[in-house]
Amino acid sequence: MLIVVSPAKTLDYESPLVISRFTQPQLLDHSAELITRARQLSPDQIASLMKISDKLAGLNAARFAQWQHDFHPDNARQALLAFKGDVYTGLAVEDFSDGDFDFAQAHLRMLSGLYGVLRPLDLMMPYRLEMGTRLDNSRGKDLYQFWGDVITQHINAALTAQGDEVLINLASDEYFKSVRPKALKGRIVTPVFKDEKNGQFKIISFYAKKARGMMARHIIKHRLTEVEQLTGFNVDGYYFVPEESDAHTLMFKRAEN
């Protein structure tokens, strides 16, 4: 069973590391090609393309300029420790054991606009390049065309290495669009999290993102390897709803307090 999650815009390169081991990203040649293209953008162009402030655009122009192919602990950080956002609040890796990191390294992948696919211990330099960014490049008009089948092939290889064929989709729509279902050698299962508001259950982005992280943590902490085991997820008030679930969707709901 392989889990995919989205990255986060917010990064943390300051907090003490809870693990010193690291690995190298596996798609750096592709990343370097994107960096070469991104370096052609002025801060004003970055601000317009990414719809961010001038200050953030300047920061990311500097990050593109400083990026280098040689990753080491002095200029990079393990991806699972670098990302900070709602999903990663739910993952809460601060108390992960060595065994937890080992299981995560085998079963968790982070999709990325710049790095394609990252394993938890893969080093990454700071960046901002969301998968939905319409950055024209040598392979097409946006990052989906740039990555093409590369991400899907990489996921297929990871599934084959596990001897498994189940992909647990805990990523956002923006990022999961980089995976091509028809080329995927496996079954996609998507947990959905709905919260009650004013008597109606709906997907509330902030809560859903955190819940995806909590589900990933639950799988890692309990070493789950079968889809059926996910139905036991009952963290933070969520409960499984079998009548709204099927072979491809697992529905979880949480009642209003």
Swiss-Prot record:
Q: Please report a single Pfam family linked to this protein.
A: H2O2_YaaD
Q: Which GO terms describe its biological process?
A: response to hydroperoxide
Which cellular component appears as one GO term in the record?
cytosol
What InterPro entries does the database record attribute to this sequence? YaaA
- As given in the record, the signal peptide range reads none
Chain segments annotated as coiled-coil in the UniProt record? none
* Domain of life where this protein originates: Bacteria
- What family is reported? Belongs to the UPF0246 family.
Among NCBIfam families, the record links this protein to: PRK02101.1-1, PRK02101.1-3
What's the protein name?
UPF0246 protein ASA_3634
